[in-house]
Amino acid sequence: MKDLLNLLKNQGQVEEFDAIRIGLASPEMIRSWSFGEVKKPETINYRTFKPERDGLFCAKIFGPVKDYECLCGKYKRLKHRGVICEKCGVEVALAKVRRERMAHIELASPVAHIWFLKSLPSRIGLLMDMTLRDIERVLYFESYVVIDPGMTTLEKGQLLNDEQYFEALEEFGDDFDARMGAEAVRELLHAIDLEHEIGRLREEIPQTNSETKIKKLSKRLKLMEAFQGSGNLPEWMVLTVLPVLPPDLRPLVPLDGGRFATSDLNDLYRRVINRNNRLKRLLDLSAPDIIVRNEKRMLQEAVDALLDNGRRGRAITGSNKRPLKSLADMIKGKQGRFRQNLLGKRVDYSGRSVITVGPTLRLHQCGLPKKMALELFKPFIFGKLEMRGLATTIKAAKKMVERELPEVWDVLAEVIREHPVLLNRAPTLHRLGIQAFEPVLIEGKAIQLHPLVCAAYNADFDGDQMAVHVPLTLEAQLEARALMMSTNNILSPANGEPIIVPSQDVVLGLYYMTREAINAKGEGRVFADLQEVDRVFRAGEAALHAKIKVRINETVKDRDGSITKNTRIVDTTVGRALLFQVVPAGLPYDVVNQPMKKKAISKLINQCYRVVGLKETVIFADQLMYTGFAYSTISGVSIGVNDFVIPDEKARIIGTATDEVKEIESQYASGLVTQGEKYNKVIDLWSKANDEVSKAMMANLSKEKVIDRNGDEVEQESFNSMYMMADSGARGSAAQIRQLAGMRGLMAKPDGSIIETPITANFREGLSVLQYFISTHGARKGLADTALKTANSGYLTRRLVDVAQDLVVTEIDCGTEQGLLMTPHIEGGDVVEPLGERVLGRVIARDVFKPGTEDVIVPAGTLVDEQWVEFIELNSIDEVIVRSPINCETRYGICAKCYGRDLARGHQVNIGEAVGVIAAQSIGEPGTQLTMRTFHIGGAASRTSAADSVQVKNGGMVRLHNLKQVVRADGNLVAVSRSGELAIADEFGRERERYKLPYGAVISVKEGEKVEAGAIVAKWDPHTHPIVTELKGTVTFVGMEENITIKRQTDELTGLTNIEVMDVKDRPAAGKEIRPAIKMVDANGKDLYLPGTDVPAQYFLPANALVGVADGAQIGVGDVIARIPQETSKTRDITGGLPRVADLFEARRPKEASILAEVSGTIAFGKETKGKRRLVITPTDGSDPYEELIPKWRHLNVFEGEQVNRGEVISDGPSDPHDILRLLGVSALAKYIVNEIQDVYRLQGVKINDKHIETILRQMLRKVEIAESGDSSFIKGDQMELTQVLVENERLAAEDKFISKYTRVLLGITKASLSTESFISAASFQETTRVLTEAAVTGKRDYLRGLKENVVVGRLIPAGTGLAYHSERKRRRDADKPLRVSASEVEAALTEALNSSGN
């Protein structure tokens, strides 16, 4: 019997579940949850503080107020557990049942649920096929709705106002049924026959032609199918029973002074109960219809306010004029249930304190104040004291700890030994914001932090605070030690470079000790070994910077692991020899034989990690830090005002600039230059002067004169403290020194425009009042920007995490052949990022061949490490196809091969790594460093003259890419395509630079030709757009009549006449319809055709075109027959910084986006409409021509008869990512977005690995739009998950049916987060109400695949160590399947047991 009870007890709480389903609650279900009906609006008796019976806090319904004690006090204590008191009707149980027992209110009249009514799209409206306005008029008793027309002429669902209703009554009597209010709506919903309606809609959709109608019908169809499939009934969207929240979740607390603090919900419930009771009474009294109606409307409004206050009409306010917080408000927003209590909870065993520097700690340690440790580790101490027999009970142990007896400290030290603690600094922007350390007990009250981890935490010691957490369980301690220990986080997950890098004083110390000085003490001596150098230095016989020779023994470990030892004599300095003593064996001496600047140290640590491994690197980093601190102390570097040496040339430079500005001012005064030109010239002048001053200053600071050993005067690098700090990268920059010792330069106004008068003084000289005033602008704007930036950056990170949170590595290899083509990132002739850097840590997708041969040198499936990179560079490969997260075919998650290397560890990524979250953090964390401002093109900042030629920087071979060209008579090539590029490759065939060639560029070199550095290889006129002939023949003018379509202009200087085509607006009536053109004919006057087509060679001329040939002239291939002047592009703002990144990730369509060719073919212009031009592209394959209307003010890059390829730019402007995806495919989109985002970050000097951006892109490309449904159940135009469609298509293909066709869709990150399969994740992100209503109506299941869902339901996340837990749990469950019992089996066992016990 006991086992049976246990079995029954365990039936209630289900531990094992794989999905959560949400649905509509039926009235029966609400009643089944309930423990009784709330009939009175009373809460508690204000004298006795006891809950009123049948009220909102009734103990009979909800349970006792005190543990195991009924209300009247008849039954007390545990022995009466489960007894129901006959006097007060209260069950004797735990008081916490008041947190879980619900009640209900029987509504006297049905009430529509506002979520399904008002949350767009209105579900009730969609089902009933009525507009929201109409339904509201029925619900709020303004109109009648016909429910059953009977034999009358009325229609079902027709609305009648009072007059019409009474007219109908007179006419038809009782033949029809029309009502108002929620009961009418409920009746109509109840009457819907879903099966019949679904069948009708499925027939209707294919017969409809209008797009909007199809959209509407398919929406209804979807909703009806959802209702049918989910087991929800439509009438459940109208409530007849209202559930009541358990009282302890809406507490009422007596304050002193007889007042009460109460949850707003109680007020809202009270209103509902009051109105409901009044309505019941009115109905019993059969009051006049109008009064009842009003009461019903008030009840509807009261319930609306309870469910979602303020959704309809004015929000109901409490006594303090604030809107009351309804049930909907409880769950949404930052303070709502999801974000406040489910996704983030406060934890026990934690403390926080100010941090100070701990320069003596090792990397894995942190200093923990004794007081804090004692408090944090209390339970452990109690346990140890009891175990030792020092205390008999916990109480005694507590007393000992409170008195802080000496033995307590001994026990504490023992407890803390090897028990890691977590340190966290808010804001936690990436995973390195929480790391584990071993605590070291210290006196004082501040936590000590190791200086090298400051960079990861972004911490400094100006009053920052940090929180300490204690991992309690053994597993938690294990994870803290194995995964989160600071020594395991040497590399940054964002870019794979070391993040444990010395900074500031340490860098300065190392730089100081590795500098060399001329004629220092001990110069030229030769030493036998490092120990001897050490001895001599300590004895003071040789200076730190002396140049010496020393014999060293070095151990060099190669990449393949082979170790070579050699002994040699090197030229070095004393300091460098001393530094080499701490370098681990395996690194050559050359790593320290240079001045150690910040970059060099970072490179050294990276190299150390790759060559000798983690443990050695950690020890080395610590040693570097101790050495750096020691020597920066010895150096005695400090700055005084005399270190800022003002250059002598400053006055002269400023004088010259002032004179030139005066000259320009006088030109402006006499009207020779315009205001704009003057402004630009002045600003250019001052920028140049500023640069000159700072050059002079740096030259002055960076060199000093000394006497060498032979007594001659020589120059050496300066030991000026200021210069050393900036040069080493410890603190400060040339720009800051310029403000201190040069001139402050140009300042900006608050609106971002530059003020013409610069600040010529510097901080050493001091600013005048006016100068000071000007410079306050910038400083204030900076502060305002920073505040905005932080909030925006945080929001971007949140959206990124949300979209990528469920992306986890779930398998090793998905087996895809797809990949992205990687080439070096070249911009305007400079290699910004070489190929090696881009493919490092990626897996090769297809075999790489040695250039020009069939030999595979890198097989597919290779994970490219540093060795392979060298190999690829060596073999001068310039393109590689690599696996990418975008192409990964894993259904849930991603595979390790497509992701490649785990950047923070340096090996292939492990299964279970949450790569989505890491990507989001890596992109979001540097967000605060990006700027907020948009840049104006114009002003001194970014003005460049228009390029008109290509000048080669490096010598090499010419390569031409997708360039269509014709050869001119003089042998030069003329480009006749838009997207052509010219590249220069070095002797190994690697591309060093790349240039875009515009249409009409004259190229003076051929493919494969060798050119010298500095040669000009192509030229064009940047101010006009030429029309180039592709064949030779005779020119004939068509429709070119003087003063009707063209006008002749004679140039005064040269006397040459030009023909200019008139604008349509300026032509006389006769010329409006004529389209002037130039036609090419052969010697006999026959039409010539464009090569390879049957299109006659005639070139239509747009307005303002200048014709440079005469009628009947003979011209050759590649000659220019006309030029179209390009108006200088108007200065447009380029969005930079954070807003640009957000725009790209949100996939926003830019204003005036560039227009791309939808199909490949020949361009023609059709009939013009008002204000628009009609562009027609006739495809080469003979399919239907494509037409598009383009506004006339858009400047077109194409003209009649020209061939374009799909996706080529027709009209310039910012690119629209959706167009790129549609026309050029996923790879082109990936390339575009990755490059655009990287440009923003690169400008700020932030390195982020491409794969993080690709990972987010994968999540943005999850959805597809069905183009043809085939034999599938999909509806055309539906958005579906790509994986879902692929699975369905596989199934259809297996059954030899027609598969569905689809196009990829790009969603912005917010949209993608809201359209995930998991409703829990979407609801906890944004628009909670909408997500939940939709999920409830469709009866959605959440399979808890992502991270957020599992956090919300309180399980381990399916990533990292949690992945193992979940797979083990599923395995165990499958093994236990046969042992499961059902409810019916339990019932049978129960009857049997009862029978046997009865006998």
UniProtKB/Swiss-Prot annotation:
Concerning PANTHER family, the annotation shows: DNA-DIRECTED RNA POLYMERASE, DNA-DIRECTED RNA POLYMERASE SUBUNIT BETA
Q: Name one GO biological process term.
A: DNA-templated transcription
Q: Which GO terms describe its molecular function?
A: DNA binding; DNA-directed RNA polymerase activity; magnesium ion binding; zinc ion binding
Quote the SUPFAM superfamilies the UniProt record gives. beta and beta-prime subunits of DNA dependent RNA-polymerase (SSF64484)
Question: Where along this sequence does the record place binding of Zn(2+) 1?
Answer: 70, 72, 85, 88
Q: How is the cofactor bound?
A: Binds 1 Mg(2+) ion per subunit. Binds 2 Zn(2+) ions per subunit.
Name under which the protein is recorded: DNA-directed RNA polymerase subunit beta'
**Gene3D superfamilies per the record?**
1.10.132.30, 1.10.150.390, 1.10.1790.20, 1.10.40.90, 2.40.40.20, 2.40.50.100, RNA polymerase II, clamp domain, RNA polymerase Rpb1, domain 3
User: What family does the entry list?
Assistant: Belongs to the RNA polymerase beta' chain family.
Q: Does the keyword Methyltransferase apply?
A: no
- UniProt entry tagged with the keyword Phosphoprotein: no
